């Protein structure tokens, strides 16, 4: 006789975490008439078990949320920490001068490091939350199985008692029938006649048969009464003890899971609030301190005027050794009196000329003019080589670095100004280094006879100016360029690299992240069009389309990855083009739909001989895929299963689909590996709704 299991001996009540705090008032909901009638029926066990499974699924999803949130916080914290540390080192190494702006930026980078540390702390706490919820889920799952096993044991005991009762009733009815037949034979024994070779039974034989039938019927009746009594007792215990017991255990487990979920989510909300508050106080504390001043207070300490003064003083000290020996602010330039002879220009005063030292290094040549030009250096201590006319070189092409000769020259003093001015005024070509060739020509009457000289290579000229020069006008630049024997080399523009597609050849997870969906839009559009207009199309995915239509449809998706296909007119009524585009998309993924590090699992699963074991191996390999790949291959497999259901019309069996899609989903595989993977595709299609849940 079965009895109700006690809480100390039955495995149906394992230790709970958190402890069960279900009070008697909580069980009042079980006393409602409709609820009590349903739970005490045969449906009660299945309903309560499904309820607990739903809660456990929610618990598992919550643990997954905590885990993924911790991963995001870890990535965010590490990236922010790396970024802040990098720029903190940059500002500390490059900005040596004590400036308030640099100090404020450094303080802000330190604050960002604190924010990164907060994110890492939050990540550790969330990871601990996830581990705790997963551990609780495992314990609750064990308790659910234990309660279910106990409940099924009691239900099966009752069903077994009822079945034994029915069998005993059948045996009693059979024995009763035999007894009645034996009694009838005894009563009609005197009138029996010989039939064939068999003699009629005697009265003694008929009496013996009657006694045996009566004894058998009495035993069957006794067994039937005992089985009926046993079934009644088992039913009474089930309805009064066992069934209410496991209903309460299921209900208590449900309350326990509810309490755990609410408590953990409440801890999560408090953690988010505290982390947000901590970040806010770090960014803007209520009472700024030297160690925690906040971003706003750090920016308030910026003083642009003080920074400018400190920078100028610091720069003056830094450039003390590299200052110009001729300071325009400390040099007094006197305009000497000059006489330009008779003519209309007599009595006029030339504008002041910026003191300029020109050093022209001539290239020795036997054809060079032996008559030296008047030296522009009045100082006799400096040897004046034969310099050609300075107008033959363009000052704009002077190199940036001076020649060694220029470093030994000194600018003209006030005593030498007359000589240099008169020499420069007597030669109009040296009066201004910025004048153009056309403006420097003297009047026709004053020009000397032309002297034919051979063409010399360009002469390098080094010019040291003691004051700021004004850029030459565009006309002068153009004229000098025209006179120059050199021409700029025309450089053909480099062809621009083709624009990288954001869809074809990209990573699957990047596409899904960019589109904010679980499945790429192009996959959704292509599969929906094939299911709506191509299920009955013979040779779908096997018969190719024209490349022009496929390329046109491809360009449309490249220009707009979120393109929507509504009617067959959007792709010229060619469903084969849509099917080809879908295969091209999966074939050109940067990483195949089955990643390289998972391909071996699928290939090994296809090599398993037993079909049920091969299905289990494929199921395990599918569950190990990343989320993006799992959702996409799930959608594709359900789509191919729909294609296979119409194989009588479209002639695309499971084997045909596997042969076509095997090389498309994986890459860099040998022929035997592709053959094994094709068997894996067949398992996916045939057992689609066993491996995947159909939503």
From Swiss-Prot:
Q: Which SMART domains match?
A: FCH, RhoGAP
List keywords of the entry alphabetically. Answer: Coiled coil, GTPase activation, Phosphoprotein
What ranges does the record give for the region Disordered, renumbered to this chain? 1-26, 320-499
The record's InterPro entries line, in alphabetical order, gives: AH/BAR_dom_sf, F_BAR, FCH_dom, Rho-GAP, Rho_GTPase_activation_prot, RhoGAP_dom
What ranges does the record list as Polar residues composition bias? 336-348, 366-382
TM regions (residue ranges) = none
What's the name of the protein? Probable Rho-GTPase-activating protein 7
What is the native source organism of this protein? Schizosaccharomyces pombe (strain 972 / ATCC 24843) (Fission yeast)
């Amino acid at each position: 006789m079965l009895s109700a299991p006690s809480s100390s001996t039955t495995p149906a009540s394992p230790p709970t975490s958190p402890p069960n705090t279900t009070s008697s008032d909580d069980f009042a909901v079980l006393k409602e008439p409709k609820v009590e009638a349903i739970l005490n029926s045969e449906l009660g066990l299945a309903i309560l078990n499904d309820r607990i499974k739903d809660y456990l699924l929610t618990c598992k999803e919550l643990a997954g949320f905590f885990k993924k949130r911790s991963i995001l916080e870890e990535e965010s914290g590490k990236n922010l920490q790396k970024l802040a540390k990098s720029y903190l080192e940059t500002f500390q190494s490059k900005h040596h001068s004590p400036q308030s702006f640099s100090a404020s930026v450094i303080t802000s980078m330190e604050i960002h490091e604190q924010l990164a540390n907060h994110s890492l702390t939050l990540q550790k706490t969330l990871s601990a939350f996830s581990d705790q919820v997963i551990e609780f889920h495992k314990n609750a799952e064990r308790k659910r199985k234990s309660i279910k096993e106990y409940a099924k044991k009691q239900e099966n005991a009752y069903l077994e008692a009822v079945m034994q009762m029915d069998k005993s009733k059948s045996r009693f009815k059979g024995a009763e029938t035999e007894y009645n037949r034996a009694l009838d034979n005894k009563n009609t024994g005197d009138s029996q006649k010989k039939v064939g070779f068999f003699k009629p039974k005697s009265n003694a034989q008929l009496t013996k048969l009657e006694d045996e039938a009566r004894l058998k019927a009495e035993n069957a009746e006794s067994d039937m009464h005992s089985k009926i009594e046993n079934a009644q007792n088992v039913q009474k215990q089930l309805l009064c003890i066992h069934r209410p017991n496991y209903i309460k255990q299921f209900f208590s487990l449900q309350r326990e899971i509810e309490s755990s979920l609410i408590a953990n989510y409440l801890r999560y909300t408090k953690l988010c609030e505290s982390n947000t508050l901590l970040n806010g106080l770090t960014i803007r504390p209520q009472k700024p301190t030297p160690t925690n001043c906040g971003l706003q207070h750090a920016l308030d300490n910026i003083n642009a005027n003080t920074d400018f003064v400190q920078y100028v003083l610091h720069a003056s000290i830094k450039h003390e050794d590299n200052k110009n020996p001729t300071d325009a602010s400390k040099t007094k330039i006197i305009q000497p009196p000059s006489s330009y002879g008779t003519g209309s220009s007599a009595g006029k005063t030339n504008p002041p000329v910026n003191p300029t030292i020109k050093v022209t290094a001539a290239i020795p040549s036997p054809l060079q003019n032996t008559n030296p030009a008047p030296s522009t250096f009045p100082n006799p201590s400096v040897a004046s080589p034969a310099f050609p006319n300075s107008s033959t070189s363009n000052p704009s092409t002077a190199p940036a670095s001076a020649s060694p000769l220029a470093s030994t020259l000194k600018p003209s003093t006030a005593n030498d100004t007359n000589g240099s001015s008169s020499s420069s005024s007597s030669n109009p070509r040296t009066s201004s280094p910025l004048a153009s060739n056309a403006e420097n020509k003297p009047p026709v009457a004053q020009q000397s006879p032309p002297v034919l000289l051979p063409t010399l290579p360009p002469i390098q000229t080094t010019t040291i100016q003691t004051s700021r020069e004004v850029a030459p006008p565009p006309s002068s630049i153009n004229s000098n360029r025209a006179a120059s024997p050199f021409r700029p080399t025309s450089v053909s523009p480099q062809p621009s690299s083709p624009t990288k597609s954001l869809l074809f050849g990209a990573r699957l997870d990047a596409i899904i992240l960019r589109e904010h969906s679980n499945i790429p839009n192009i996959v959704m559009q292509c599969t929906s069009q094939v299911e709506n207009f191509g299920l009955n199309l013979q040779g779908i995915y096997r018969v190719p389309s024209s490349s022009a239509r496929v390329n046109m449809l491809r360009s449309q998706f490249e220009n707009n990855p979120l393109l929507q296909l509504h009617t067959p007119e959007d792709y010229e009524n060619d469903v084969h083009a849509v099917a080809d585009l879908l295969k091209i998309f999966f074939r050109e993924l940067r990483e195949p739909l089955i990643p390289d590090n998972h391909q071996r699992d699928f290939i090994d699963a296809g090599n398993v001989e037993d079909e049920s074991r091969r299905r289990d191996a494929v199921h395990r390999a599918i569950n190990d895929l990343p989320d993006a790949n799992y959702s996409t291959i799930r959608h594709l497999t359900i789509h191919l299963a729909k294609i296979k259901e119409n194989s009588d019309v479209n002639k695309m069996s499971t084997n045909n689909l596997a042969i076509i899609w095997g090389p498309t989903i994986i890459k860099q595989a040998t022929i035997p590996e592709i053959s094994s993977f094709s068997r894996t595709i067949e398992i996916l299609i045939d057992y689609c709704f066993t491996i995947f849940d159909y939503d």
